[in-house]
């Protein structure tokens, strides 16, 4: 079978299966599996495709038709211009999260602190932690993750991007984890850091019931945020405040309807200068504030 005919068959398969991004997905599969980008398709569309390669392509297309996320099929996805390995058991990096990273970087640029100590909670692939370390080379960055399924991806992505990120396996809602982290300083007091950053699970129970078949493939542990979606914001804002310096930054990615609620949580938990920022689609996406000085 020639390249252009295989392309047409693949795209029509995805279209018939209801894949909205059928053309984009077909392009990605062809480039990844056959090494055929749009230029190749235009110039060499009559090229014969070896049967084993066509079979691999069809197998991948069938998985996509059944709802498996494109990113899981490819095994990698880009975030902030860098590659990250992904697969079943880890949340797929999304453009919305880049807004969180941009705002955190902007904060430290404006403050003149280019060597902050940062904790990325619910790290998953490590896309936030790795990006912050690469963009702030003098920073000390910790990535905290509970999931045994996500942990191999986190470690792999740190190595892939040659980022000196320190990995901590643990539950961000466990006060013992924070106490153990604070004890690393050996000074008899809570260790103080400059920022807590997190894209925590924030979907409500109702939203979990209405997920697309693609998102249902992603780990529930990384998605479900309790009945109202705010469980992790409440806990992190309270527990992790103890190891933030006075004036230290807390920054969250949020669901598009959660801006007011998360802002209220932070203000009631001892933070000031709390602001809500929008993503490029105009939806509330990030909430940031700074720790009030303890009196």
Please report, for each region that a protein language model flagged, where it lies by residue:
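Residue-level signal for inorganic ion chemistry
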Residues: 29, 67, 97, 128, ...
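Active-site beta-alpha loop architecture of Rossmann-like, nucleotide-cofactor-dependent enzymes
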Residues: 71, 203-206, 257
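Mobile active-site "lid"/loop adjacent to the S-adenosyl-L-methionine
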Residues: 202-231
